């Protein structure tokens, strides 16, 4: 198995300047809720607004949702660019 991209969490950011605004209240990484497919991203680009995170990890799940990692995207096209510095495990 190879190294996976770091896990995205509540408050992590995107290349659109947005922020992940919902995440698990049960599963955490570094003490911060893990973002899953369907959690929400708030994008500051006019017309984008709040959209769900639509791509997810390679089968890894939290709360029944695919885990979001750096490189995954929101419905508005934003790419997640920050995540846990210690979660790049396989």
Language-model features, listed with the residues they occupy:
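Intrinsically disordered, low-complexity proline/glycine-rich segments
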Residues: 1-90
